Amino acid sequence: MSTRPPVLPLDHIVRDHLPQAQWMVGGAFRFDRHLMLLLNFLSTYFPPRAVGCVTGAPPCAWSLDMFGQRAALTMARCEALLAAYAQHQIGVTLMFDNPSIAPDALQDEFGHWLVQRLMEQNPTGRNKVCVASDELAAAIRQRQPNAPIICHANRLVLGSEKRTPSFYEKLEEIYQLIMLHPRDAVTPSLYTQLRHPERYAVVLNDPTPRNYPSRRELLTLLSRMRRAPWDYTLRQAREGMTSRTGLYAMENSGNLTMQEQQALYACGVRHFIVQDFHFRSEITLLWDTFYLLLSTQPEYSNKAALLASAALAHIREAQDRLPSGLNLFQFTED
């Protein structure tokens, strides 16, 4: 007979400024082992509403990588990961964020196979596909007409249209859910005019400066890197671009403040995304997730810090396969 004390829900430590938010956390097909441990920890100690969906995609013609090119995953590995998330009753959103896909790649068999298996392993009914290309959305619908499709913000970044409420309404005719352009997420004069705000999603931890002048250039470069991963000059160009513009300057970060989150929520937005695209290590993703979920009230700060530290210690080894500067802060077995 177990003598462990019962686990009590910690509703009072979870931030309550977005009580009905539908959270989506990145890291799928990249940080899966630690992401599943995080989800188990959250389901044990936190209210069920905390996280209902993970996002991500394996490296393929339809996805992008910020730091070099990840090694390809086998079909068997992808199948196993989809099955594991289904077993955990967690929805999966395939994040196909490449906005510049070659016409012949729209029929990529691996990508279409992923979408097919995603729809077949969908016990929660929450599985979706997120694309950054109208052409890719059309290609997917030809094979999977019932697949719910989200419009990725990268489609808006590379688009030439003027982003007005009427433009967003046209996107509503094509997509089930639309990610707001990062600039529009901090422009109340625009998002308060949206007729169906519940059909929009917002990234909370966008790393790029608010007025980043080279967002389009960066996405175009990353798309070229996907097509030619062996071209080292492209990687050098990407490194030069990010260092030149101060992409990671925290004082200019596009992270949404609590007041900005509350304003979007009050307007009717309910879908909030914690992305992993710009993280080299899963530890950073986990820390961001806890920061966004846990209360910042002073009377709970010690409990919140203890829970976050306990979770990171519980997860232990963070296997950052890319240079990150976090080697001194790894959790390992004694």
Predicted features, each with a name:
Residues S2-F167, I174-D334:
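Active-site pocket-lining/capping segments in soluble small-molecule metabolic enzymes
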